[in-house]
From Swiss-Prot:
GO terms for biological process: apoptotic process involved in development; engulfment of apoptotic cell; phosphatidylserine exposure on apoptotic cell surface. GO terms for cellular component: plasma membrane. It comes from Rattus norvegicus (Rat). The gene is Xkr7. Residues 1-22 have a biased composition (Low complexity). This is XK-related protein 7.
Amino acid sequence: MAAKSDGAAAVAGPGPEGPAGADRGGAGGRGEVAAGIAGPGPVEAGCPGPRYELRDCCWVLCALLVFFSDGATDLWLAASYYLQGQSTYFGLTLLFVLLPSLVVQLLSFRWFVYDYSEPTGTPGPAVSTKDSDIVGAAISTKDSAVAFRTKEGSPELVPRPAPSSAGAYRRRCCRLCVWLLQTLVHLLQLGQVWRYLRALYLGLQSRWRGERLRRHFYWRMLFESADVSMLRLLETFLRSAPQLVLQLSLLVHRGREPELLTALSISASLVSLAWTLASYQKVLRDSRDDKRPLSYKGAVVQVLWHLFTIAARTLAFALFASVYRLYFGIFIVAHWCIMTFWVIQGETDFCMSKWEEIIYNMVVGIIYIFCWFNVKEGRSRRRVTLYYCIVLLENAALTGFWYSSRNFSTDFYSLILVCVVASSFALGIFFMCVYYCLLHPNGPMLGPQAPGCIFPEAPGPCGPPADAITSPPRSLPRTTGAERDGAAVGGERAGTPTPPVFQVRPGLPPTPVARPLRTEGPVIRIDLPRKKYPAWDAHFIDRRLRKTILALEYSSPATPRLQYRSMGTSQELLEYETTV
């Protein structure tokens, strides 16, 4: 099955390479995606997938608690300003709550519309399985609805029977109810709450269901968790970060002890920022089979790391903005431009189109105003060190300018704030060192993996079989004319025939190894090179590809594998053919 970027589907025949071979076909152009069943490939029956545990459920519940506490304290504080007659503070506080929420709800509802919509004139994706050796998947296209069925490795197209009138009526009623419910949820600004609850439901279903459905629900739970983590990351840096700077600036400007409500709002915004960053990194690592997952200990230490560094950063901003408001605005814009240019210069590869990549880089530039955010593959030690050296100098300069405007002899309160900025930043750097030295998940997940195994857990069963060819032929060194002549003359002089160009080295007879029984399962081939960490895989951000994969995955009696196109394999094959 091939899914192009325009939503159409085509059928691809069985591939000879199986689950471990690379996709040697396809144009590989930008924006063109092929998700195909590459034929029956060996999938070990004894390869269990990850399980949804109680701590995963508790993590989602804590995320919901952080979400509600952040929004509730901000709205409560805005109402307090309104009752006190402070219309300016009320307007700014409410603006930083409603505007980011509206943007995120529109984006969330747009995702829902695409995920739940159907092409015009065709029914939606329908899947069915009858026997263990039959895989049936009906994939919608723009022109017609067809069913793709493989039996004993041979694909064929069969027309899908039209649904009965009663079934079609019930289907339309159910769809209408879902549309009304989702519209109401997003109008109430609860789209993220719905996605959190849905991720929780899918995770629990993956724990309670059988093996095949367990994998299916776990896969959908990862998709939902990825969506809500990206939405929360966008919202927190559009809402919580400006709200935190605003309330701290007002607090410093008034020069009095904070009220309980103001302190709660500041604390909730700070925790929301730190929690969202750690949660995003955890979901990103959990979604990639080529990286070790982030443990909950590491996630908690990440929360503390970001909590203290962002606290020092925002307090330095608030101190400077309380005295030099115009210069603070110039500083923020200049810092954002420099950081955005730095990100663009690094040539990130997160999105599927150029314009989406530019918007993403601009959002990352906003994040870099407050904290570190890894967007480039490879070792990040030098980049982290450079970033925090710049942040340290900026914090010291902003705090120093503010302190120079105070009365040195009598204002002991100012000295305390300077010490708070310094100690908070030092604590954040300490927790960052603890994370990278003790809790950072280094290395590939459980050793080398077959490309794209959806649910890897043990390296043995999930890897390629022993009789599969996993590496392409290497390029041969060119033979010069002198070497050819010398070899010919030497062979004639010695009176011995010239040895053959290719020789087969005798090896030891294969030792029989007991292997578990295998069931035949499809390999879903994606005609795109796999994005490297810390980018999301294409099947997480391309919703067309996601819909096709979910339909194929649900219809297969055995767990399919995702297989991205290997750029290195294509280059090596081309070099080999040219050389020989």
